[in-house]
Amino acid sequence: MRPIHMAGEEDLQPINLKISIYLESLNTERPSRYMNLMKERLQKKMEQQVKKQKSKSRSKAKEILTNNSKIIATATSVPLTVGAYGILVGSATPFLASQTNSFIQSSVHRGFENLTGSGLMSTIMNPISNGLSSVLGNTAEAAITIATPIAVLYFVPTLFRLFFYVSKKMVHLLANLFDSTESHSLNSEYFESGLPLLTLLCNLSTLAIIDDLTLRLKAVGIEKISINLIKLKNKILNKENSNLNVEEKMLYDLAKKNSEKLIALALKIGEEKIFKRIQSLESVTSLKAQIQKFIPKVDMWANGKIDFWITVMGALIDKESVQARETFFNTLQSISTLKTPNAPNPHSLFQLDMEPRHKQREKFSPTDQPTYGRQAF
C-alpha cells in the first residue's frame, strides 16, 4: 500500500477549532453541534477527494461515497460507546441523558458486554477498527486519507470527556467532606509537590491512547500513520525541541490542555485538613500500597512529594470499576518502563496495555487488589 498522505495544516486547523468547540460544550445540553460540524467537514472532504480521483472509474467513486456513511457512523459511534462506559461508572453525560431510555439501555448493554470481554481500550476502539476494516477492501485511498486523522482527533477528546466527567463526579463527592465552618484555602505545599507527576500521568495517558490506535490501524492494513511516539514522549518528559508535525503538535497541545483541567480539579481538594482526611480513606491507602509495588524505587517516596498525587488519583478513580482501576495501573507500569530509554520499539512504552487480558489479571491477584467500596465516602 502506498504511504498515506495525511491532511495538511490547512486541513487540520478547522478540525482543531471544532475540537475546541466540542471541549467547550461538554457541560451544555447541545454537544450535537460538534457532531454536526464534524459530519459536514467529513462530507466535504470526502466529496473533494472523490473529484480528485480522475484515474478512477465512476463505479469506484460511487463506492467511496457509499462508504462515506460507514466512516461517519464509525466516528459518531465512538462518543456513544464511551458514553455507555460513563453510565456504567455512574457518570452519564447530559448528552446521553437526553436520549431515549431504550437507546441508553442498549448502549449500556453493549458497553458492559464489551468492557467485560476486552477492556476499556478495546471497547472504544472497536467501532473505529470495525469501520475501517469494512472500507479497506477495494476502497480508494481517499477514504483512508480522511478516516485516519478523523479517527485520531475524534477519539482523544472523547475519552477525556469521560475521564474529566468522572473526575468532576468524584470531586463533588469529596466536597461533601467539607464542613461549612472550615477554611477552603489551598495548601500550596501539598498541591505543588504533586504537579509534575499529575501532569505526566495525563500526558502519558494520551500517548497510550495514540499507541493503541496505531497498533489497531496497522492491524487493519494501514502501515503508516504520522505520529511519532518517541518524539512526543521526549517533548513531554524532557522538554526537548522536537520538531513535531501538525498531528503531533495538536495531540501534544491537547494533552497539555487536559492535564491543566485535571490540575484545576485537584485544586478543589487541596485544603490541608481535608487532604489529610482523604488520605486516611481505605481506597487511598490501598492504592498507595499498590503503587509502591509498581514503582518501588521512585526517589519521591523518601520525601513524600508523591503523596498528594496518589491521594488525588485515588480519590478520582471510580472505586467500583475494575476496568478503570486496571487502566490506571497499566499507565503506572508505563511510567516505570520509561526509565529504559533504549526500548526496542515505541510500543514497548506501553507493554502492559498490549498484553492479553488474562495475563494482566495474573498481575492483579485478589489479595493485591485495592479495596473499593461505597463506605469510604
Swiss-Prot record:
Transmembrane region(s): 71-91, 140-160
Organism this protein belongs to: Coxiella burnetii (strain RSA 493 / Nine Mile phase I)
Compartments (UniProt record): Membrane
Lineage start: Bacteria, Pseudomonadati, Pseudomonadota, Gammaproteobacteria, Legionellales
Location (main, coarse): membrane
Protein known as: Uncharacterized protein CBU_1819
Keyword annotations of the record: Membrane, Transmembrane, Transmembrane helix
Membrane topology listed for this record: Multi-pass membrane protein
A Gene Ontology term for the protein's cellular component: membrane
